């Protein structure tokens, strides 16, 4: 059976290093940034480096690689410099992923910055309609990540994500990345079997389980509905181990990537520890 548990990996020294780092940590899948996250414009990845990445990925045996866009991008921003840079930045991400052979990009929907949720959501829809139409090179999925709802961030309700998907001229191009910390902080409780069942019934009714393409596995330093995004090691936070065990043993999610974004530790040892903890939760059938 293929393994779909993994973690976010650094691309320090070149993007081709990420697959090997993932294997060393014990990953079956990895997530990565395709560029420096503190810069609007990424360094051009040369054709030889693209080829090297693909060779290293093939050698690694990893089952999937997922990209995460840079945090500077805000597709809900008002017309102006930030919106222009966001559109250019996301288009560059789409093109890089096309060249790398990466078929899923995780992204935070954006912040309306006081202009209101309806306005912000409309801007996101318009941005994606433009990006998808103008970037035919990328044929993969865009995964809208659930958010904690800090400040004016959008995406903290399932309804927000549905609005973006259904409002788009290209609804088939979207999936969802369910971040356990973010959704818990936004008020979605999966800490007991009963609550877990209710949340997934709601997700299926509003968005559809077929849209779920990825998990970000993070416990939360803060409590339910706190609207604060603070990641903690698996089982060490306010969510607790039960929720992660429920997901790990849910046959509906067996083939969906589950990506750790928890603290790495002084020597990157914590990914291996958290991955083992998750795999040990799986009950033998």
Curated annotation (Swiss-Prot):
Cofactor detail note: Binds 3 Zn(2+) ions.
Family: Belongs to the AP endonuclease 2 family.
Name the UniProt record assigns to this protein: Probable endonuclease 4
Function: Endonuclease IV plays a role in DNA repair. It cleaves phosphodiester bonds at apurinic or apyrimidinic (AP) sites, generating a 3'-hydroxyl group and a 5'-terminal sugar phosphate.
Catalytic reaction annotation: Endonucleolytic cleavage to 5'-phosphooligonucleotide end-products
Residues that bind Zn(2+) 1: 68, 108, 145
UniProt keyword annotation of Metal-binding present: yes
Gene name of this polypeptide: nfo
Names of required cofactors: Zn(2+)
Enzyme Commission designation: 3.1.21.2
Assigned keywords, A-Z: DNA damage, DNA repair, Endonuclease, Hydrolase, Metal-binding, Nuclease, Zinc
HAMAP family: Nfo
Superkingdom: Bacteria
InterPro entries assigned to the protein according to its UniProt record, in alphabetical order: AP_endonuc_2, AP_endonuc_F2_Zn_BS, Xyl_isomerase-like_sf, Xyl_isomerase-like_TIM-brl
Family matches, as Pfam families: AP_endonuc_2
List of residues binding Zn(2+) 3: 182, 229, 231
Recorded GO MF terms: deoxyribonuclease IV (phage-T4-induced) activity; DNA binding; DNA-(apurinic or apyrimidinic site) endonuclease activity; phosphoric diester hydrolase activity; zinc ion binding
Residues binding Zn(2+) 2, per UniProt: 145, 179, 216, 261
Gene Ontology biological-process entries: base-excision repair
SMART domains: AP2Ec
């Amino acid at each position: 059976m293929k393994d779909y548990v993994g973690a976010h990996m650094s691309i320090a020294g070149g993007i081709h290093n990420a697959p090997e780092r993932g294997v060393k940590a014990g990953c079956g899948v990895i997530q990565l940034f395709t560029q420096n996250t503190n810069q609007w414009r990424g360094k051009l990845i040369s054709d030889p480096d693209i080829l090297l990445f693909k060779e290293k990925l093939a050698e690694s045996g990893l089952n999937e690689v997922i990209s995460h866009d840079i945090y500077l991008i805000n597709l809900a921003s008002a017309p102006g410099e930030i919106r222009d840079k966001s559109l250019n930045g996301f288009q560059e991400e789409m093109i890089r992923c096309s060249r790398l052979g990466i078929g899923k990009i995780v992204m935070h929907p954006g912040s309306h910055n006081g202009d209101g949720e309806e306005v912000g959501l409309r801007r996101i829809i318009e941005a994606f309609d433009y990006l998808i139409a103008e970037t035919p090179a990328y044929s993969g999925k865009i995964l809208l990540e659930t958010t904690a709802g800090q400040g004016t961030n959008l995406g903290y309700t399932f309804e927000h994500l549905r609005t973006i998907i259904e409002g788009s001229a290209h609804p088939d191009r979207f999936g969802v990345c369910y971040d356990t910390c973010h959704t818990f902080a936004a008020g979605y409780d999966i800490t007991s079997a009963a609550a877990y069942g209710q949340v997934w019934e709601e997700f299926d009714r509003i968005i559809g389980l077929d849209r779920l393409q990825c998990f970000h596995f993070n416990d939360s330093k803060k409590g339910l509905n706190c609207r604060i995004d603070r990641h903690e090691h698996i089982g060490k936070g306010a969510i607790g181990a039960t929720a992660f065990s429920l997901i790990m043993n849910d046959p509906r999610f067996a083939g969906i990537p589950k990506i750790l974004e928890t603290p790495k530790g002084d020597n990157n040892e914590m990914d291996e520890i958290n991955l083992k903890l998750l795999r040990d939760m799986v009950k033998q059938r």
